[in-house]
Amino acid sequence: MELILKYFPNLSDTQREQFAALKALYEDWNSKINVISRKDMDNFYEHHVLHSLAIAHEIRFREGTKVLDLGTGGGFPGIPLAIMFPDSQFKLIDRTGKKIRVVNEVAQAIGLKNVVAEQLSGEEEKAQYDFVVSRAVMPLPDLVKIIKKNVNRKNQHNSLPNGLICLKGGDLQAETKPFKNIVSLTEIHDMFKEESLVMPVCAASYTVRTSAARRGAVCGDEDGGEGRRDGRLRCWRPALRAGSGLSACGRRC
């Protein structure tokens, strides 16, 4: 818990209590249903909670923001984000019913009023949200295809354009190949000085914003863009046309 306060010192008393309660709750549920690797519970706050909160470092969801956590598993990143942003609304979905049971029980136990959890696949979820978040769910091209229908492109009221924010690892060279424009890539290690969190966060255009875990991430749109490579930071920005009124998402918003 001290690790969370190290990077987020301005938590309310309620938020502190909610974060502090998480480990015992997940240890109890993990003894019944394996939702987190049991050998990883000693690093619970670093590997799961703080990792999820890398998204909170990139964007502060404003009041009324609607967020879908696709493939939430045991509730990550959705539960930590819901604690961090009590005035935003979160829907957490997973195709595995026992994991959704854990999510519902944890949310109820810590008094989260802004979380709905349901057993659904990404393909089955039809509603629209300001942002879709995910954590190591599937190859990025597949993820983008699924979530395009779920992103509300009309109501833009956050500091970033509506879209996808995901924590993603693996061989990202192959995953990035179908995409042309990467908006930004940031190392999580630059946010949190913990040895095990050496992973980048990436943002992308096409109303899709992507955060990466461990090696990088992507997204893009069909418009041309200009890019730069700066050490471990790789950024691409949409090519803005004079008088086009384009936002950072690379499209008229």
PLM feature spans:
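Conserved SAM-binding loop and adjacent beta-strand
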Residues: 36-56
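N-terminal auxiliary segments of SAM/dcSAM-dependent transferases
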Residues: 1-33
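Conserved SAM/SAH cofactor-binding pocket of Class I
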Residues: 53-137, 144
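Active-site capping/gating segments
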Residues: 169-214, 220, 253
